Amino acid sequence: MSHNPIRPWRNIDRRNSRRIMVGNVPVGGDAPISVQTMTNTDTSDVRATLDQIIRAADVGADIVRVSTPDQDSTRALREICRESPVPIVADIHFHYKRAIEAAEAGAACLRINPGNIGDATRVREVIKAARDHGCSIRIGVNAGSLEKHLLEKYGEPCPDAMVESGLDHIRILQDNDFHEFKISVKASDVFLAAAAYQQLADATDAPIHLGITEAGGLTAGTVKSAIGLGNLLWMGIGDTIRVSLSADPVEEVKVGFEILKSLGLRTRGVQIISCPSCARQGFDVIKTVEILEKRLEHIKTPMSLSIIGCVVNGPGEALMTDIGFTGGGAGSGMVYLAGKQNHKMTNAQMVDHIVELVEKRAAEIEAAQSAAAE
């Protein structure tokens, strides 16, 4: 639950869901909304896959999914799971035996697709492997691969068909006394996905994995995911998210966190509030923000920073951020700390100075948190 007593219009009441574990990461219940991505390497190339997982983890990925289409992949999975800094989800399609092999290799979670995993007998074999090896399961319904009988029944992918697919497989898991599962009903169509997820949220208390599948490239996919996921998250639906982009998985993680930051659901690192710039700017806002984004990537402590080109909105934005800089005249601007004017700084020295202030503030916050935990 995200409650703000001062600004109640920001409140989001999260849907009540069961809590499960994906490795050491809690999903559902009152756990933070976790951010996932998926590797796009050849899984049998252990080094390349691990390198990508580590880069994703470095920018905050909580969980990483890895495709396991063949035995070479599941053989490689053992070392990948052992060396990965975050839990690994094995992505399974068509071959239920790959799920069994992935569980034996150390996967924290098995993603199965109801549209191609096979009948209940095969699913029961996957359940047994998951139980024996301490894995959770994700029921991953996708509009593009629904079961044939559902397409015949409904005529096309639709929310009813997607939710029916998911609930049918929930019953199989529950009938076999397996409850460590989460579920997704993904589509590339934002309207279809949103409607299916809303219907699903009313039908089960299982943790929900949100995603808009095949969303597109970096720009188009970011926009589509922000609309689809943002809308659902605002409604309180969603326990873990994956932004699907035809781009570096690192970008998926960054976009995922930005969506959560924008809704106040989870923060990581520096949230920069900056203007688009105009003729009034007292310094080059766009170039400054680009530099600051790169130089502040290492900061994991949540905080806010406003970089505004002039005094029209600069002082007002600075009131609501931890650190602010507002452009002025004569090659200098005003630095704000905790919403109050503090001192002037030249434009030439501003970037280095802001980085120093952010690093100092991050250290103070971390020290206070450590002291409180003792």
Curated annotation (Swiss-Prot):
InterPro entries: Dihydropteroate_synth-like_sf, Enolase-like_C_sf, IspG_bac, IspG_bac-typ, NO2/SO3_Rdtase_4Fe4S_sf. Transmembrane segments: none annotated. Binds 1 [4Fe-4S] cluster. One of its GO terms (molecular function) is iron ion binding. Keywords: 4Fe-4S, Iron, Iron-sulfur, Isoprene biosynthesis, Metal-binding, Oxidoreductase. Its cofactor is [4Fe-4S] cluster. It comes from the Bacteria. Gene3D superfamilies: Dihydropteroate synthase-like, Sulfite Reductase Hemoprotein, domain 1. Its EC number is 1.17.7.3. Pathway: Isoprenoid biosynthesis; isopentenyl diphosphate biosynthesis via DXP pathway; isopentenyl diphosphate from 1-deoxy-D-xylulose 5-phosphate: step 5/6. It holds the Pfam family GcpE. HAMAP family: IspG (MF_00159). Converts 2C-methyl-D-erythritol 2,4-cyclodiphosphate (ME-2,4cPP) into 1-hydroxy-2-methyl-2-(E)-butenyl 4-diphosphate. PANTHER family: 4-HYDROXY-3-METHYLBUT-2-EN-1-YL DIPHOSPHATE SYNTHASE, 4-HYDROXY-3-METHYLBUT-2-EN-1-YL DIPHOSPHATE SYNTHASE (FERREDOXIN), CHLOROPLASTIC. Belongs to the IspG family. This is 4-hydroxy-3-methylbut-2-en-1-yl diphosphate synthase (flavodoxin).
